[in-house]
UniProtKB/Swiss-Prot annotation:
The modification Phosphoserine is found at residue 30. Retains hemagglutinating activity up to 42 degrees Celsius. The activity then drops and is completely lost at 65 degrees Celsius. Lectin that binds beta-galactoside and a wide array of complex carbohydrates. Plays a role in regulating apoptosis, cell proliferation and cell differentiation. Inhibits CD45 protein phosphatase activity and therefore the dephosphorylation of Lyn kinase. Strong inducer of T-cell apoptosis. Has hemagglutinating activity towards human erythrocytes. Optimum pH for hemagglutinating activity is 7.4. Homodimer. Binds LGALS3BP. Interacts with CD2, CD3, CD4, CD6, CD7, CD43, ALCAM and CD45. Interacts with laminin (via poly-N-acetyllactosamine). Interacts with SUSD2. Interacts with cargo receptor TMED10; the interaction mediates the translocation from the cytoplasm into the ERGIC (endoplasmic reticulum-Golgi intermediate compartment) and thereby secretion. The lineage of its organism: Eukaryota, Metazoa, Chordata, Craniata, Vertebrata. One of its GO terms (cellular component) is extracellular space. The keyword Hydrolase does not apply. Residues 4-135 form the Galectin domain. The modification N6-acetyllysine is found at residues 13, 29, 108, 128. It is found in: Secreted, Extracellular space, Extracellular matrix; Cytoplasm; Secreted. It comes from Capra hircus. The gene is LGALS1. This is Galectin-1. Keywords: Acetylation, Apoptosis, Cytoplasm, Extracellular matrix, Hemagglutinin, Lectin, Phosphoprotein, Secreted.
Amino acid sequence: MACGLVASNLNLKPGECLRVRGELAADAKSFVLNLGKDSNNLCLHFNPRFNAHGDANTIVCNSKDDGTWGAEQREVAFPFQPGSVVEVCISFNQADLTVKLPDGHEFKFPNRLNMEAINYMSADGDFKIKCVAFE
C-alpha cells in the first residue's frame, strides 16, 4: 500500500469523536485507519479487508504497543462496497473506542494502551479521504 494521509498533534480527548468520510476504490482490497500516539503506539488499527491477508469481507482491529502488535479482534459486520463513499465515526473514551460503521452498526475496541489523548492519525490503502471532522 502506498503511504496515505498522516496527521499529528490532534489532541483528541476522551468524549470526542473523529468522523472520516472517503471514497473506496472500485477494486478495493483493504484500507487502514490508525489512531494513537505515533506510528509505533496505536490504540486502534482499523483494517477493513475486502480480500487481503487471507481475510474476505472482515474488519480486523488491533493495537500496537511500542512497535509490537496485540491480539487481533475481528468483526463480522462489513457494510463496505468497492466504489462507494463511506463514513466511519470513532468515539474515543478512556476505557474503549466505539466505531460506528456506515450502516449504523457499532462495536467497541478496548483502549489497551490506556491513552489519555489521541495525537496521531494515518490512513492508507484503497480509500481516498474526502473529509475529516473532530466533534
